[in-house]
Amino acid sequence: MADDKGTDPKEGCSEWFIDNEADCSDLENDLEQLFDESPKSNISNLLNDEEDVEQGNSRDLLRQQEFEESAEQVQKLKRKYFSPKAVQQLSPRLQSMSISPRQKSKRRLFEEDSGLELSGLEQSLTNEIEDTPAELEVPAATPAEQGGQGEGNLHYKELMRCNNSRAKLLSKVKEYFGVGFYELARQYKSDKTCCKDWVIAAYGVREELVESAKQLLLNHCSYVWININGIMTLYLLCFNHAKSRETVGRLLMSILDVQLLQLICEPPKLRSVVSALYWYKGSMDSSVYAHGAYPDWIVNQTMISHQAAADAMQFDLSEMIQWAYDSDLTDEADIAYLYAKMANSDSNARAWLAHNNQARYLRECAQMVRHYRRGEMRDMSMSEWIHHRIQQVEGEGHWSEIVKFIRFQEINFIIFLDAFKQFIHGKPKKSCLLIHGPPDCGKSMFAMSLLKVLKGKVISFVNAKSQFWLSPLSECKIGLLDDATDPCWQYIDTYLRNGLDGNVVSVDCKHKTPMQIRFPPLLITSNYNIKANDKYKFLYSRIAIFEFKHKFPFKEDGTPVFQLTDQSWKSFFERLWTQLELSDPEDEADNGGTQRSFQCTTRDVNGHL
C-alpha cells in the first residue's frame, strides 16, 4: 500500500485526475514538483508546517480598495471646502468676486496623494481655510431681471463688472453718438425733482422692445425722439406731466425690461442753442424716430421767426417793478421765486432769467417797491389807510365779537371807544394805548389782530442796544410794543416822553441820515401796571391805560370763544366809522373807481393788459 501511488482505481475513478488550468498557480509544473519532492505518499506532506506561510492576495486587495476609497473622499473634501491656491495667486481680487456660481478648479482631482497629506488632513484643511479669502458670490439673475437674454444679457453683465458703471455708459454715449451726454443734458442732484422733459441713454436694450416702446411711450409723452445706434439708445421724452427721475426710471424699466443700472436720466438743456439744434437736426435723420410737435424750448431757439423775436426781446425793469407792486410783494425771495415761475408765459420774466444781472435787478426791484409803498402810505390819511386796508379783507365778520370781548374784560366800551378814537387819530398825549393784565388774558391776541388788519410794525425791546430799533416806526401807520417789562418802561420814561407827546423826534435808520418823524399810534401790552409805581407818574398823562382782568376763554374743542379776526375788525370799522370820526371815503375820492391805479411802467395806458 505504501508503494502504490495515488488511490484505488476500483472506486469510481481508475485514472489520475489532472486539471489542465490551475486557478492560483503561477508555475506550469507545480503538481509534478510536489510529487517529485516527496517519494512517500503521506498526505501530511502537502502542508508545510515548518514555517509560516504569507497571506495571499486578499489582504493586498483590501488595502488597495481602502486606499482608493480614502483618496476619493479626500478629493471630495478638497473640492468642497477650498479652491486651488494657484488661481488665487494670479489675481486674489478677481478670485474673491464671482457673478454667478462656478465650478471649482479640478487640477488636483486626479493627483495621487503620498499618504502624508492624508494623515494630516485635518491640519491641512484648517490651514487652507485660514489662507483662503472670503468669496463674494452673487446669485445668477433670472432672464426677466436682466432685461433681456443673449446679447443684452452679456451687456448687462459687462456693466455689472465695471467699478463705475455710470462712467462706462457716458463713454458709450460719446462713442456711439459722437456727443457727450452732459452736452445735451443738465444734472439734477435729487431723484425727487420733477421735470416735464427728460433725456435718457439706455444700454443693451433689445431691439424688439425699443420698437414696441415707440407706441407705448405715446400714451405718456407729447413728443418722442428715439435714436438707436448699436447697443445704445438715446431718448428725448417730453411728458404730458412733470415726473421725477424715480418715476421715469420705473416707467422705462417696465417698458424696456431693463435695470436702473442700464439707464441715465437727466433733464435737457433748455437754453442751449447747440443742444436744441442737435435734437432738431436729429429729428430729420432717417435713423431717428420722432413723433409729436417740437417742444417750445426747441422751437424758440431753432425757428427763424421765433429767434428774431427772442433777439429783439429785452428785459424791462419797470415791468418787473409794476408786477411786484401789483402783487404787493416786497421780499426779494418771494419776488425772485414767483417771477421766475412766470417765465413760461411772460417774455419779460424770460428775459430776466436770461440776464446775467438777475440779483442786481431783483434787489433794485424790491427796493423800488418798498419806496413806492412807503410813499403811498405817507400820502394817505389814517381814514384812507383804514379804508384801503379793510377793502383788501375778504369775507364777512361781526363787529360784536370785539365789543363782547372788551365787555368780558370788564371795560366800559364807551370809554374804550373814545380812547381808541383819539388813539387812531394820533392826538398829542393820546396816541399811546396800554393794555395790561395777568398772563393768558388775550392782550397780545387783541393787539396782534388789530396790527394785522392795519398792516402795522412791531418793535422789540430786545434790540434796544441798537440805535436802529425804533426805525420800523417810520414805515407804518400803527406800531406795537409787545410785553413791555420794567427795564422797557424805564427806557420809555427816560428817552421817549417827547415821542409820546406827539412831537417830532429824530429816529436813526440804517444806511440813512436820522429822520425827523412823529411816532405813529403806539399800542403797548404788558404784565406790569405802571400806575402801581409812582416813579412812572410822568407817563400817566401820556398813556391811556386799560386792564384785562380775565383769562381768554376757549371752547371745549379748543377754538376761541371770541373771534378776533380780520373780518371782525373790518365789520367793526365799517359799523363804527362815524363814531370814530373817520372821514367819508367819497369825500377823498378813494372808492369811486374812477381814479386810475398807480402805474410805474412806461407802457401805454390804453394798451393790452
Curated annotation (Swiss-Prot):
A motif (Nuclear localization signal) lies at residues 78-80. The modification Phosphoserine is found at S83, S91. GO terms for biological process: DNA replication. The keyword Isomerase applies. Residues 37-67 are annotated as: Disordered. Keywords: ATP-binding, DNA replication, DNA-binding, Early protein, Helicase, Host nucleus, Hydrolase, Isomerase, Nucleotide-binding, Phosphoprotein. PROSITE patterns: SF3_HELICASE_1 (PS51206). GO terms for molecular function: ATP binding; ATP hydrolysis activity; DNA binding; DNA helicase activity. SUPFAM superfamilies: Origin of replication-binding domain, RBD-like, P-loop containing nucleoside triphosphate hydrolases. It is found in: Host nucleus. It comes from the Viruses. Phosphorylated. It is an enzyme of class 5 (isomerase). GO terms for cellular component: host cell nucleus. It catalyses: Couples ATP hydrolysis with the unwinding of duplex DNA by translocating in the 3'-5' direction; ATP + H2O = ADP + phosphate + H(+). Its EC number is 5.6.2.4. Residues 148-312 are annotated as: DNA-binding region. Gene3D superfamilies: 3.40.1310.10, P-loop containing nucleotide triphosphate hydrolases, Zinc finger, large T-antigen D1 domain. ATP binds at G437, P438, P439, D440, C441, G442, K443, S444. Belongs to the papillomaviridae E1 protein family. Can form hexamers. Interacts with E2 protein; this interaction increases E1 DNA binding specificity. Interacts with host DNA polymerase subunit POLA2. Interacts with host single stranded DNA-binding protein RPA1. Interacts with host TOP1; this interaction stimulates the enzymatic activity of TOP1. HAMAP family: PPV_E1. ATP-dependent DNA 3'-5' helicase required for initiation of viral DNA replication. It forms a complex with the viral E2 protein. The E1-E2 complex binds to the replication origin which contains binding sites for both proteins. During the initial step, a dimer of E1 interacts with a dimer of protein E2 leading to a complex that binds the viral origin of replication with high specificity. Then, a second dimer of E1 displaces the E2 dimer in an ATP-dependent manner to form the E1 tetramer. This is Replication protein E1. It comes from Human papillomavirus type 49. The gene is E1.
